[in-house]
């Protein structure tokens, strides 16, 4: 349904054909709009300003607003009439902001809307809604918005520190008055209140026999509601023994009026708060219970419940109007990250303590190197285990073998086959003559491969054919009368062919024993098959 052209100005829709908001320069005439029910709170729910502040409206106003809306809905339901409910306000920017804020907060706390949906209808309003200022006398340089109020209440509800069903409107409106103590609940943990004044009291004089009525009301209420700690932030205006005599602890944490506390004082306040038992209540006051009180309570709510600075300022002002004044707003905004960091710092410290408690420190052994298998034998006398095969070792004077020369499983099998084939060849061909091979030069020691146990070795020998074929006889045996180098070859003792040159002698000296390939029984050596004349490991 479009009401834009009905002379009602801009109609902001929250629920189609059910709930709307608009601002009008004059009250509408009901007979012109029979399908709508108009109501306003401008003259019914009134904000009581300190100076130039005008809102937001407090939590008792919110509850009363919900009662009004539900009363209208119930009336139409009983009459079986379907009318759109329209909240309207004056075009005054302050009244307009209060009405729109109250409706959005109602949608979140009562109708359980998520904050972004409650704010969406107000986002395109023209002109935009005015921000809320502090209660100070100076020129305002810091504002909170309807969005801050909505998210502040939402976060308080999500953190279980606000349940409007548990708020007694009568008590709220009674005790917020100066003559009745001037205090408000901020959360189930905190009460903010103005300093009690004990007329005629000072440090040197005796305690007055009778307390002023506001002080007596505060004292009785605190005892009945499990207040365990009083934190005084201003200079003394009463005797602290008044609280101590009824079992309430009293703590002085003074700093100047209108200023902000040191971060060390904030940490002390947080630590002090967490020392109070879970169901114990802490009452905090300065002179008026607004500025300095709001600093410390706001810092704790940011620390504990993840409020942003704007959210916590807005929330506290809804619970107790006027809280946090002037530069204290900027202080909360600047230091909000430090409050959260302190939370994680303490959480980490607790986690470390729990881990340490779970694994208590043990006395170290008298001999740290003793075996840990339950015996008293020292590791010094315990034999070392066998070295793992294949561990790298350095040998002086030799270069380490290249990676391609390391034995693999296939090369080990090949070497074993070669060994068996050589033995079989010696037995079957022991009558063949070895006449024309050169001195069977054996490669350097680094080409020797060791497999199996350390006592069993297999020597892999490279055999080369002669580059000259002129000395090969028809039967395939090379003539023993000459060497491939051209030097005369002679038969030496020990069944070795050697040349007369010094090179041949040195080669013979370098060669390893070929007992695995020789059979000296007949003075002959086995001749390998030509296809296996070059073996590469």
Swiss-Prot record:
Residues 400-411, 490-502 have a biased composition (Low complexity). SMART domains: DSPc, PTPc_motif. One of its GO terms (molecular function) is protein serine/threonine phosphatase activity. It is an enzyme of class 3 (hydrolase). Keywords: Cell cycle, Cell division, Cytoplasm, Cytoskeleton, Hydrolase, Meiosis, Mitosis, Nucleus, Phosphoprotein, Protein phosphatase, Septation. Interacts with ark1 at the kinetochores. Interacts with bir1, cdc25, mid1, nbl1, pic1, and rad24. This is Tyrosine-protein phosphatase CDC14 homolog. It comes from Schizosaccharomyces pombe (strain 972 / ATCC 24843). The lineage of its organism: Eukaryota, Fungi, Dikarya, Ascomycota, Taphrinomycotina.
């Amino acid at each position: 349904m479009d009401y834009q052209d009905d002379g009602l100005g801009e109609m902001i829709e929250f629920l189609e054909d059910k709930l709307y908001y608009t601002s009008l320069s004059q009250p509408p005439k009901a007979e012109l709009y029979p399908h709508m029910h108009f109501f306003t709170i401008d003259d019914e729910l009134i904000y009581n300003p300190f100076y130039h502040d005008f809102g937001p409206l407090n939590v008792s106003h919110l509850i009363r607003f919900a009662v009004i809306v539900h009363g209208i809905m119930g009336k139409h339901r009983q009459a079986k009439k379907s009318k759109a409910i329209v909240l309207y306000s004056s075009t005054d920017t302050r009244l307009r902001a209060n009405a729109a804020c109250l409706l959005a907060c109602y949608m979140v706390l009562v109708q359980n809307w998520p904050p972004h949906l409650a704010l969406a209808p107000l986002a395109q309003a023209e002109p935009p809604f005015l921000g809320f200022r502090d209660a100070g006398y100076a020129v305002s340089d810091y504002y909170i918005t309807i969005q801050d109020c909505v998210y502040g209440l939402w976060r308080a509800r999500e953190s279980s520190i606000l349940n409007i069903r548990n708020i007694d409107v009568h008590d709220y409106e009674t005790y917020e008055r100066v003559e009745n103590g001037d205090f408000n609940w901020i959360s189930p943990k905190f009460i903010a209140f103005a300093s009690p004044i004990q007329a005629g009291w000072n440090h040197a004089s005796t305690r007055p026999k009778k307390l002023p009525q506001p002080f007596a009301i505060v004292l009785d209420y605190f005892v009945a509601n499990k207040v365990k700690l009083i934190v005084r932030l201003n200079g003394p205006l009463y005797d602290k023994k008044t609280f101590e005599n009824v079992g309430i602890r009293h703590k002085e944490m003074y700093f100047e009026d209108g200023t902000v506390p040191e971060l060390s004082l904030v940490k002390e306040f947080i630590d002090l708060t967490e020392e109070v038992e879970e169901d114990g209540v802490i009452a905090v006051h300065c002179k008026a219970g607004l500025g300095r009180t709001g600093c410390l309570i706001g810092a704790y709510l940011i620390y504990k419940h993840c409020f942003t600075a704007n959210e916590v300022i807005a929330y506290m002002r809804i619970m107790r109007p006027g809280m946090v004044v002037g530069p204290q707003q900027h202080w909360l905004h600047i230091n909000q990250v430090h409050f959260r960091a302190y939370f994680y710092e303490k959480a980490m410290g607790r986690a470390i303590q729990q881990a340490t408690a779970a694994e208590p420190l043990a006395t170290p052994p008298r001999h740290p190197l003793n075996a840990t298998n339950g015996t008293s034998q020292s590791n010094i006398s315990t034999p070392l285990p066998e070295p793992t095969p294949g561990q790298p070792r350095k040998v002086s004077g030799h270069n380490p073998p290249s990676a391609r020369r390391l034995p693999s499983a296939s090369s080990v099998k090949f070497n074993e086959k070669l060994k068996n084939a050589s033995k079989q060849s010696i037995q079957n061909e022991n009558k063949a003559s070895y006449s024309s091979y050169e001195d069977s030069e054996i490669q350097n020691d680094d080409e020797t491969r060791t497999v199996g146990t350390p006592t069993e070795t297999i020597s892999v020998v490279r055999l080369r054919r002669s580059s000259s074929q002129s000395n090969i006889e028809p039967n395939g045996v090379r003539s023993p009368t000459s060497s491939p180098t051209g030097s005369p070859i002679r038969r030496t003792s020990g069944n070795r062919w050697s040349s007369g040159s010094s090179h041949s002698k040195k080669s013979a000296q370098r060669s390893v024993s070929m007992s695995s390939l020789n059979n000296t029984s007949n003075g002959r050596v086995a001749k390998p098959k030509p296809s296996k004349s070059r073996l590469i490991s």
